[in-house]
Amino acid sequence: MKKILIIICFLTCWLGVSAQSLREVWIEMPDSILPYLSKSQRTELADYVEMKAEPAVLSTFGDSVRIERMTNNYLLLKANEATRLEIKLLDNNTLALVQTWMAPAAESKLSLFNLQWQPKEVVVDYKANIVKPESMSDEDFADLKTLMLPRLKEYRLSADNNSLSVSWNYPLLSKKDVKRVTEILKSQVLNWTGKDFR
């Protein structure tokens, strides 16, 4: 019984530290990542989340900056109509940052840091898996492959686990052609191993 109580106390303390760590990580984020959002505004947003108030402030450009979701280890921020930012605590010494710009097709950048925002090497073991459906002719398959460039990579971090989804956007294609191309190059989900996403 004592062991169970000790474990419960440990888990409770650990969760509290995780929640505090994410708040601190967010507040101490370098200004260079979001130059139009000051440290005091980041603190204000985190306070609003804790108070269950509307977590939104105006940036120096007059855009509404809003925390869409904040948990013990995940944050999703809408910086403006064209910019999304995600932060995920992957382990005790690693956080992932995904910045996505929509202009209008979405393109993302993935960065890894330690909890003091010092950069770490980013390794994403991803190979584009282009597969020809059995019902598709060789000619149609060859035609579709010529449509696949240029393409933009979009990342999404999971709020529920340490996974990273990878999908593709095609800024020059019609909706019809995007649907056709998606049949041969589907999105993938990669998992954090402690060193890389694979």
Sequence positions of predicted segments:
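Bacterial Sec-dependent N-terminal signal peptides
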Residues: 1-24
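Surface-exposed loop/turn elements that mediate protein-protein interactions on large endomembrane-trafficking
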Residues: 62-76, 112-124, 192-196
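Short, exposed beta-strand/loop patches in secreted or surface proteins that constitute
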Residues: 65-68, 84-90, 153-159, 190
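Mid-length scaffold segments of soluble, non-membrane domains
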Residues: 93-126
